[in-house]
Each structure stands twice: as C-alpha cells, then as structure tokens.
From Swiss-Prot:
Protein name: Stromal interaction molecule 1
Taxonomic path: Eukaryota, Metazoa, Chordata, Craniata, Vertebrata
Organism from which the protein derives: Rattus norvegicus
Residues on Cytoplasmic side: 235-685
Domain EF-hand: 64-97, 102-126
Gene label: Stim1
Pfam families, per database record: SAM_2, SOAR
Length: 685
C-alpha cells in the first residue's frame, strides 16, 4: 500500500515538473516571436518610407504594401529580391494554373526582366485597379469573381481598389473575421481573382463586356441569316431544277414529235413511190388497151370492107356507133366535172420556183432551231455534271448558268415548235394549191432547172446552203414537202390529164375506119367527131352552127353532107362550155340518125331515103363520083373525086393529125396524158 502511494506521488511530481518546463519554453518562444515581428514591422515600414515616402504614414497603404511584398516573396523562389522570367513563368503555371501564360507574362514583365518589390509597387500604383471605387470593386466581385452574396459586406467595409492586394494574399483575419467568408472555396477563389487583378490589371471581360455581347449577337444573327439564306437558295435551286427538267422533258417531247413527223414523211415517200410504180403500170395497161382498141377497130374495118352484105356492115356500124356514143357520154361527164379554168404552164414553173425558195428559207430556220437545241442540250449536260460535284448544287444555285440554260431550252423548244408548225402549214398549203391548179408543184426538176427554164439571173437567187450532216434528222429534211405524196399523183390518171387530152388520145385507133359511104355516114359521125381536139374556136363555132342547121332543116343527110365528122371534131374549141355545146349537138344528130336507120333496116342501098339515089353504095360501084367506103389510105382518097371536094381534104388532114397525135400528147413535159378506154371489144359471132 505504501509502495503504491509512493509511486503515484512520484509520477504526479514528474508530470508537474514536465509541464512547468514546457510552459517556460513556450513563454520564451513568444517573447522571441514578438520581438522578431516587431523587428520585421519596423523593417517593412522603413522600406515602404524609402520607396513611397508620401504614403508611409497611411495605415491602409502600409497594409497594402505589406501584401504586395508578400506577393513578391511568393514569386521570388530564390529569395534574391528580384523575380526573373523563369520564376514568374513557374508561378503562373503552378500557382495560377495558366496553361499558356505568354500574354500574362509579357504584361507582367514588359521590358524589365527582373521585378523587385519597388517595381511591383509602382506597377500596382499605376494600375487602373488602384483607383477603383467601391462600386467598381462590387461590380468586379459580381461579374468577374461571381460572388454576389458578399456585396453587402463589401459595401459596409467600403473596400476600394487600394485594398485589393490584401485580398490577394492568404489572410485568415481579413477573409474570415472581416469578410465573414466561411466557405474555403470562396476564400480561395477570391484570393486567386484578386491576385490576377493586382498583377495583370483589370480583366478584359469586365472592360469589353458590352462589345463582346454585341459581337456575339451580331454573329448569331449573321449565322441564322446565313442558314436561312442557304435554305431558301437550296429550295429555290431545287424548284428551278425541277422546272428545268420539265422544260427538258417538253423539249424531248417536241423533238419526238418532230421525229414522228419525219417518220410519217418517210412513209408518205414510200407510198408516193408505190403510187408512181402503179401509175407506170397503169399507163402501160392503158397503152395496151389503146393498142387493143386499134386492133379491134382495124378488125371491124376489115370486116366492114370484106363483107358484101349491107346488113353486116350496118350491124358493125351500129356497134361502132354505140361505142362512140358511150365514149361521148363519158367525155361529156368528165367535161362537166372538169370544166374549170386551166392554169398556164408558165404558172406551174413559177409556183415550183416559189416552192423551192420557200424550202430554202425553211431549211435555214430549221438549222437555227436544231443548233439552239444542241446548245440547250450541252448546257443541261454541263449543269448535270456540276451537280455531281461537292459544291456543285450551291454553285449552280448562286450562278446565272441555270437561268441561261432554262432560257436556251425555252427558246429551242419554241423554235422547234415553230419549225414543226411551219412545216405542217407549208405542206398543207402546197397540197391545196396543187389540187386547185391541177398540176404538180412539190415534185419539180429543181431550182437550177427552173431558173434556167424561166431565164432568171442566177445571182438573184443567191447561193443555196448545203445541208449539214450533223443535225438530228436522219434524212434530208430540206425535201420534206417533196416526200409528201402529191394529191395529183394519188388521183386517177384520167384526172391528171386535161379535158383536151381526154378527148384526143382515146382516138388513136380510129384513124382510117371512119371513112364510110353515104349510107354509113350517120354512124361514123360520132366516131369521127372524137378524132381531134385542136384549139380552133372560130372553126368550131361555124361547125357547130352548121351541124345544128343541117340537123334541124333536112335530117341527118344534110348534116353528113354539109359537115364532115372529122372536120367537126378537128374544130373542137378549148372552151369547155363551147365543147360541151358541140358534143350535145352531135349526140342529138347521132340519136336522130340512129332512129332513122332503125326505122328502115331493110331498105336496099339504092333506095334509101337518106342517101342520094344517083349514087351507089357498093364497094364495087364504077361511078367515079362515089366516095370510097373503105377509106384505108389517104392517097386513095386524094385520087378520087367526091361530091364534096373539101371533104376528102379534111379527112386527109384528120388522118395526118391522127398519125402524129401520139407525139403531140407527149410534147408537154409538165403534164402526163392518160387516155380513156372508149372501145370495148365486141363478141365474135
């Protein structure tokens, strides 16, 4: 028990002794620190009075100088009294966390590479922040430091720009007790912002805030406007491209219609060639029929001359009379349907020349239209190639090439439509002119032949332009209208010849079979009337009057004696009305003669009341005044004396005209003759 008490007392005494020693040691340290603090304060005050003597008595300025001195001490790592470039760069990177301190470094040093405490204090006094008012400091606190909750505290303390260095150093009394900042992050943030402001001046954000806001707003407006403009231009470009594609499709359709028209022209050309071949065959067939008619007429003539039976001759004469009458009826009908005005041959050549000149002008217009079409196609292909590039759509939308190509397409389309319409109108117009004039105009020997035929100076016509081979048309469109089937070539061959040719050519085979005796003169009258059609209107008028007077006064006998049928037909005029009147008179006389023969079929030749009783109608009659019933040669007729002296001469002239009528019908180069089939081969009994 005693031992334990003693141990406890020894321990308590040791503790008290150790505590006393520690208290004495701390007291001695406090005295030493107080003495050193007093010494540092005295040295700081002396240095401040040396640097800035007018402000060395101001307590606030002393605190600010001490804060600047502490900042300089933080930056001076080697404690040599100067801050060099390396030390400032290290301080900016490590303490202020500047990754690119080039601007701040140049602002801090300037031209002086070593910064002392005096240099740092003078720089601080020259700074704009040193002269800040309380409001400016509060504005800096709100906008730059972003601590608006301490605004009231700053206003109560009336902190100006002079107190900024005290905020830049670590001072627990200032930040904790005076400013009442309990949040450590707020104290650190305020210290860093104040240190940056003291060393490098006021922040740029504070000085140029409005300018930057204005520039930001302007940039946003420009960006939005640019996006909107790009959107509008893109939409306009798409719409324009759609419109251009529609125009291209319309142009392709017009081109296709022109190709279709070209194909139709080719088909019409083939039909035209087929019709020409058929026309040649038909002409050959008609010539064969004419030869057959001539042979039949010769056969009838031989039968009439070889028989001695009057009834047989009368029968053949009646058959011949019926055929002639039928031919006259056909000629009369054709004369009624075609009794119109006949254009002169010179008009045909002039119209053909006019057509060729119009074709030249049409070819020039067509070539221009096709050239515009090629240019528009090339422009469209270029735009398509540009659209495939990276900025092609934007470039096309902002350039004028799209409008130019669109204009070229519309121009080419309009020109192509005009050429197509002009082609159709020209073909229709020349077809109507051919129908009205009755001859071919589109199919002609060519402009050079026409110029030579009309005796025109070639210099008036100019030089014809060659047809280019690189155009769209596969064939020569210069002769489009010539490839169209002429309306005259599609008609019947009988309609292509004039009325004068219809009345003339079918009589090639009637040459010598019309020389009958007085008993056969009634039947041969109608046949001989169609031997010739010559342009002799005065003779035709007299012949028609003689025929009418003879028929009305003394029957058909005086008609035969007074007017020979060959001379009557020879005097047919060109006038359709007068020719029609003559044919009607001849039909009346033929009908009357035929009725008289039917009333007296059994009367012998010597006692016929229609003939002169003093003349014989036998082929063996010895009377020299009796006309030959055979009439097979003009020499035999010229050697005999007839009762009517001029009758034989006119008949001889008719035979001569009949021999050369084939050559006369082919003398006109502009017209082709198609004779009528007026004889039918009678059945042999």
């Amino acid at each position: 028990m005693d031992v334990c008490a003693r141990l406890a007392l020894w321990l308590l005494w040791g503790l008290l002794l150790h505590q006393g020693q520690s208290l004495s040691h701390s007291h001695s340290e406090k005295n030493t620190g107080a003495s050193s603090g007093a010494t540092s304060e005295e040295s700081t005050e002396a240095e401040f009075c040396r640097i800035d003597k007018p402000l060395c008595h101001s307590e606030d300025e002393k605190l600010s100088f001490e804060a600047v001195r502490n900042i300089h001490k933080l930056m001076d790592d080697d404690a040599n009294g100067d801050v060099d470039v390396e030390e400032s760069d290290e301080f900016l990177r490590e303490d202020l966390n500047y990754h690119d301190p080039t601007v701040k470094h140049s602002t801090f040093h300037g031209e002086d590479k070593l910064i002392s405490v005096e240099d740092l204090w003078k720089a601080w006094k020259a700074s704009e922040v040193y002269n800040w008012t309380v409001d400016e400091v509060i504005q800096w606190l709100i906008t730059y430091v972003e601590l608006p909750q301490y605004e009231e505290t700053f206003r109560k303390l009336q902190l100006t720009g002079h107190a900024m260095p005290r905020l830049a150093v670590t001072n627990t009394t200032m930040t904790g007790t005076v400013l009442k900042m309990t949040d450590r992050s707020h104290r650190q943030k305020l210290q860093l912002k104040a240190l940056d402001t003291v060393l490098f001046g006021p922040p740029l954000l504070t000085r140029h805030n409005h300018l930057k806001d204005f520039m930001l707003v302007v940039s946003i407006v420009i960006g939005v406007g640019g996006c909107w403009f790009a959107y509008i231009q893109n939409r306009y470009s798409k719409e324009h491209m759609k419109k251009m594609m529609k125009d291209l499709e319309g142009l392709h359709r017009a081109e296709q219609s022109l190709h279709d028209l070209q194909e139709r022209l080719h088909k019409a050309q083939e039909e035209h060639r087929t019709v020409e071949v058929e026309k040649v065959h038909l002409e050959k067939k008609l010539r064969d029929e004419i030869n057959l008619a001539k042979q039949e007429a010769q056969r009838l003539k031989e039968l009439r001359e070889g028989t001695e039976n009057e009834r047989s001759r009368q029968k053949y004469a009646e058959e011949e009379l019926e055929q002639v009458r039928e031919a006259l009826r056909k000629a009369e009908k054709e004369l009624e349907s075609h009794s119109s005005w006949y254009a002169p041959e010179a008009l045909q050549k002039w119209l053909q020349l006019t057509h060729e000149v119009e074709v030249q002008y049409y070819n020039i217009k067509k070539q221009n239209a096709e050239r515009q079409l090629l240019v528009a196609k090339e422009g469209a292909e270029k735009i398509k190639k540009k659209r495939n590039t990276l900025f092609g759509t934007f470039h096309v939308a902002h350039s004028s090439s799209l409008d130019d190509v669109d204009h070229k397409i519309l121009t080419a389309k309009q020109a192509l439509s005009e050429v197509t319409a002009a082609l159709r109108e020209r073909l229709h117009r020349w077809q109507q002119i051919e129908i009205l004039c009755g001859f071919q105009i589109v199919n002609n020997p060519g402009i050079h032949s026409l110029v030579a035929a009309l005796n025109i100076d070639p210099s008036w016509m100019g030089s014809t332009r060659p047809n280019p081979a690189h155009f769209i048309m596969t064939d020569d469109v210069d002769d489009m209208d010539e490839e169209i089937v002429s309306p005259l070539s599609m008609q019947s061959p009988s309609l292509q010849s004039s009325v004068r040719q219809r009345l003339t050519e079918p009589q090639h085979g009637l040459g010598s079979q019309r020389d009958l005796t007085h008993s056969d003169s009634e039947s041969s009258l109608h046949t001989s009337d169609r031997q010739r059609v010559a342009p002799k209107p005065p003779q035709m008028g007299r012949a028609a009057d003689e025929a009418l007077n003879a028929t009305s006064s003394n029957g058909s006998h005086r008609l035969i004696e007074g007017v020979h049928p060959g001379s009557l037909v020879e005097k047919l005029p060109d006038s359709p009305a007068l020719a029609k009147k003559t044919i009607l008179a001849l039909n009346h006389g033929l009908d009357k003669a035929h009725s008289l023969m039917e009333l007296n079929p059994s009367v012998p030749p010597g006692g016929s009341p229609l003939l002169d009783s003093s003349h014989s109608h036998s082929p063996s009659s010895p009377d020299p005044d009796t006309p030959s019933p055979v009439g097979d040669s003009r020499a035999l007729q010229g050697s005999r004396n007839t009762r009517i002296p001029h009758l034989a001469g006119k008949k001889a002239m008719a035979e001569e005209d009949n021999g050369s009528i084939g050559e006369e019908t082919d003398s006109s180069p502009g017209r082709k003759k198609f004779p009528l089939k007026i004889f039918k081969k009678p059945l042999k009994k």
